[in-house]
Amino acid sequence: MLMVISPAKTLDYETPPVTHRFTQPQYLDHAQELIQQLRQLTPLQISELMKLSDKLAGLNAARYASWHPEFTPENAKQALLAFKGDVYTGLNAEDFGEDDFAFAQDHLCMLSGLYGVLRPLDLMQPYRLEMGTRLANARGKDLYAFWGERISQWLNEALAAQGDDVLLNLASNEYFGAVKRKALQARVIDTEFKDLKNGQYKIISFYAKKARGMMARYVIRERLRDPAGLKDFNAHGYYFSAEQSGPDQLVFLRDAPQD
């Protein structure tokens, strides 16, 4: 089973990594192509394109200028530890042991507007480029066109390498939109996490993002390979709803937040 999650806007390059193991991203040449294009934009253009404040636009212009593909532990950080945000709070990789990282490396990946796909231990230099950004490029009008079927091909190869055909989608619609479902040689399992609010179960973004991370953590810590075991997920009060679920659409409900 292979899991996909979204990246995060918030990054942490201050906290020392809890593992010294690292690998290199597999689409660095494509990332460099995008960086070269982004370097041509002024901070004002970046602000307008990405709807960022002047301060954030300036920060990312500086990031693009200093980005270079010789990734080392001194100028980059493992992706799973560099990303911060609700999904990564739920995942809590900071307390992983080496065996956890080893399993995650083969069974988890992060989709990225700049890097395409990142494995947990892939080094990453800081950036801001969301998949939904309408950055016109040589391959089309946006990043979905830029990545084309490359991400789907990567996922197929990763699944084949582990001898499996189950893809667990824990990513947002924005990012999973970069995956060509019809090109996947896999069974795709989608997930929904709903919380009770005003008498109805609803998807509440903050809680749902955190729950996706908790589900990824559950799979990693339990070394789960059989998707049937996903129904046993019960972190922080969530429980599987057979009534609302389908064969490839797993719905988890929660009656009250426990965090």
Curated annotation (Swiss-Prot):
Classification via InterPro entries? YaaA
One CC-aspect GO term: cytosol
**Which GO BP terms apply?**
response to hydroperoxide
Q: Which domain of life is it from?
A: Bacteria
Q: Which NCBIfam families match?
A: PRK02101.1-1 (NF002541), PRK02101.1-3 (NF002542)
UniProt lists the family membership as follows: Belongs to the UPF0246 family.
Q: What is this protein called?
A: UPF0246 protein PA14_18590
Organism in which the protein naturally occurs: Pseudomonas aeruginosa (strain UCBPP-PA14)
